[in-house]
Amino acid sequence: MAIEMLGLILAGGQGTRLGKLTKDVAKPAVPFGGRYRIIDFALSNCANSNVKNVGVITQYQPLTLNAHIGNGAPWGLNGINRGVTILQPYFSQEGSKWFEGTSHAVYQNISYIDQQNPEYVLILSGDHIYKMDYEAMLESHKEREASLTVSVMEVPLEEASRFGIMNTDDNDRIIEFEEKPKEPKSNLASMGIYIFNWKRLREVLVNGYSKGNPMEDFGGDVIPAYIEAGENVFAYRFKGYWKDVGTIDSLHQSSMEFLDLNNELNITDKSWRIYSHNDISAPQFITEKSKVKNALVGDGCYVDGTVIHSILSQNVHVQEGTTIEDSFIMSGTFIGENVTIKNAIIGENAKIGDNVEIIGEDEVAVIGHGEIKGENKNEQ
């Protein structure tokens, strides 16, 4: 049975710039915002955009990500004529081969895509924080009779050299793609979100590999090939909140922005919910002696200290005399007495001993998942 559009989320990245936080988990599985993981935003956008069939392409440390996604029920992807499929490298007659790039990962999953029989494929990165209506992007793609549509957003020209830049004509037709140009001609940065006509993309990928011209990456290989061939390639301008949280600084910055009541993400918007897989925990408990100001405190938390402008994920335990400020504490962490944590990210299930100081002065301080720092005399 044919479908109109298949979503493919690229979620195999190692995320080396996140250091300790991706030692044992893929970047899209890194927690965010107190109750989410990064991939929840792409999955929720699919759910809200009526994209009913989604393939999640994984590779590096996929166990946490696989368990989190499960059968896709939190995103409504577990019903009739809908579903989510985890796509990992596998052994075939051609042998076993790791994904070598973004478009190579799609090429390796041609059999799955053919089974879904889509007219269009929506390619997404699984490691960005944003809300976006993919249906509106598809309508633009159809109206302009595009072969490829690339979602872009304007960035400050002085920062454009950090991105893949799309140079367009007056009708937003892309006439040139430049990967991190030293002297950018435009400030339209690619968001790594693409809509392709599947039959044409399939043809380009198969022809490239069969002729010894491998199409390994969308930015470096596929998009330039489309432009050179004179295909109808258009930019789709996005004007909402979008953050690539691939570094410690950007993850911390986006987490702190999450605490702003005027944040463009507007997580309380009932018309565009962000869904997630969450375990059921007891209610939070905040003692009479504690002080909590401008903070998100998750279910199952016990707070007997001071928490200012910070995020506590589920089941975080904060003992007496401890101060947490401008920090993101991931789930399951136990923090002892008289601890000072400022400008920091603490990984899941970490244990912070009594009288410990974790202060990010010139850069954000990071404690990894399950890391132990100091000793807790009252650890539970």
From Swiss-Prot:
Keyword Methyltransferase among UniProt keywords: no
Binding site for alpha-D-glucose 1-phosphate: G164, E179, K180, S190
Gene3D superfamilies: Hexapeptide repeat proteins, Spore Coat Polysaccharide Biosynthesis Protein SpsA, Chain A
Keyword annotations from UniProtKB, A to Z: ATP-binding, Carbohydrate metabolism, Glycogen biosynthesis, Glycogen metabolism, Nucleotide-binding, Nucleotidyltransferase, Transferase
Recorded metabolic or biological pathway in which this protein acts: Glycan biosynthesis; glycogen biosynthesis
Catalytic activity annotation: alpha-D-glucose 1-phosphate + ATP + H(+) = ADP-alpha-D-glucose + diphosphate
Keyword Thylakoid included in the entry's annotation: no
Its EC number(s): 2.7.7.27
InterPro entries xref list: ADP-Glc_PPase (IPR011831), ADP_Glu_pyroP_CS (IPR005836), GlgC_bac (IPR023049), GlmU/GlgC-like_hexapep (IPR056818), NTP_transferase_dom (IPR005835), Nucleotide-diphossugar_trans (IPR029044), Trimer_LpxA-like_sf (IPR011004)
Pfam entry (one): NTP_transferase
MF (Gene Ontology): ATP binding; glucose-1-phosphate adenylyltransferase activity
Top-tier EC class: transferase
Domain of life per record: Bacteria
CDD domains, per database record: ADP_Glucose_PP, LbH_G1P_AT_C
GO biological process, one term: glycogen biosynthetic process
Family per record: Belongs to the bacterial/plant glucose-1-phosphate adenylyltransferase family.
Subunit structure: Homotetramer.
Job description of the protein: Involved in the biosynthesis of ADP-glucose, a building block required for the elongation reactions to produce glycogen. Catalyzes the reaction between ATP and alpha-D-glucose 1-phosphate (G1P) to produce pyrophosphate and ADP-Glc.
Protein name: Glucose-1-phosphate adenylyltransferase
Organism: Lactococcus lactis subsp. cremoris (strain MG1363)
Gene of this entry: glgC
